[in-house]
Amino acid sequence: MSLVASFQNPVADAQYSFRRILKALSEPGVSVQLPAMPGFGALDSASACVLLTLIDQDTPLWLSASLNDEILRKNLRFHTGAVLTDDPSAVSFALADPALDSATLLAFPCGDEMSPELATSVIVQLENLTGGTPLRLRGPGIESSRMISPQLPDCVRDYLINRPHRFPLGLDFMFTCGEELIAVPRTTRVEVC
């Protein structure tokens, strides 16, 4: 097992990453570039940046089986103090891969009417942010509509289109591939083009 360096310039890179993540969340469907860095284990650069920027000892994290290896766990604990759990119903953040299933997705907390911000932010590391089913996004941060076509797991696409929780409840999604990030927060309406 070896520890991997985090950001090259920890303070500046974390601040820059935070601003880029905020841009992606406030402008759903806009692809943002995050700092290039080595991932941990099977993690790509963008997923590593998101975790290093947003995760700490107060944000329980669930990891999908294919990404959950010793290198990732030790690096997350060292760099972030992350509390890792196998219980999807007790997390603030989840890191998933395309094998994410519907039962796990629906087990993530979606907040409640008094505290919708307690919903899980789901980071899904994808093979590609293009070439999937074309989706039209509407809502806050989008002037009229925006099109995206990430190669989403079926359960995530179905969740986004059918939103099983009434507003303001729901999950926030961040899709990563390489050094790129696209976000679709729970306030965004999604339909197939």
Where are the model-predicted features located?
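N-terminal, charge-rich interaction modules
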Residues: 1-60, 64-67, 78, 178-180, ...
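Internal, well-folded beta-alpha domain core
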Residues: 71-183, 188-193
